[in-house]
């Protein structure tokens, strides 16, 4: 019996993402050239950050395109994990770039080169404008799409990097302190590293089928036991195919006095959808725990368990 399901379909955000990607990608090239010409490590480090923005935007676009592909006999879950693999690659790339920037900044702090502050300022201001336009393009979709929200946050963080480079250019222009450029690069690198770790950690959690970060497992267990007609449960598993697509399977021992399919199942479905936004659910009902049940994963609402017959009710 189906326990109900819903699948999110990609929204109409392709146009905004394509425009933001075109703007960011074009300016990325200009910023690298500007960083080399002005000898500004801060500009180059900001360009490295903008590279990750470009990759993030490309991932968001690819995810929308790939999500439209139906599941097939080879990949019955579809192609959602592509987004997670790409995010993990993006995190590793960003980590390597950040380490290189910190190392290069260390070398430059010992012997600061002459910085062309005017060119550095102009390029950084252009970057700020590009980021503001990209944020405006993505703002309407970031509240309804996790893909777009991720890209929006990437652009937002790069905007902060542009502000830092502008501040550095002004300081160098009026003080001549060339070391400020390397100091700004260090700050950008230190800003990027924690984000890299969180992105990699979240990606690995999905790939290892861990409980999604936004789901409180203890609260799910509590709410299942609080559902009328549930005596106990075991083998509860919660994971995500990709961000925002949580799935749940569980074996529920029901009270013999209730009809699980007609009374308990609708309550569990509604509770999981309303409280935890989990709509991809498979539930197996039993009158007693199955022999394969893991005692460590068995949770009782009542000490009395009777019967041996089991029936299943699932959904996707």
Curated annotation (Swiss-Prot):
Q: Which GO terms describe its cellular component?
A: plasma membrane
Topology relative to the membrane? Multi-pass membrane protein
What domain of life is recorded for the organism?
Bacteria
User: May I ask which residue range the UniProt record assigns to the signal sequence?
Assistant: none
One annotated GO molecular function is: zinc ion transmembrane transporter activity
Q: Identify the Pfam families for this entry.
A: Cation_efflux
**Main location as per UniProt:** membrane
What keyword terms does UniProt attach to this protein?
Answer: Cadmium, Cell membrane, Cobalt, Ion transport, Membrane, Transmembrane, Transmembrane helix, Transport, Zinc, Zinc transport
The compartments listed are:
Cell membrane
Q: Where are the transmembrane segments?
A: 17-37, 47-67, 82-102, 115-135, 152-172, 174-194
InterPro entries the record matches: Cation_efflux, Cation_efflux_CTD_sf, Cation_efflux_TMD_sf, CDF/SLC30A
Supply the Gene3D superfamilies for this chain: Cation efflux protein transmembrane domain (1.20.1510.10)
Q: What does this protein do?
A: Necessary for activation of the czc determinant.
Describe the family membership recorded for this protein in Swiss-Prot or TrEMBL: Belongs to the cation diffusion facilitator (CDF) transporter (TC 2.A.4) family. SLC30A subfamily.
> What protein name applies here?
Cation efflux system protein CzcD
> Which organism encodes this protein?
Alcaligenes sp. (strain CT14)
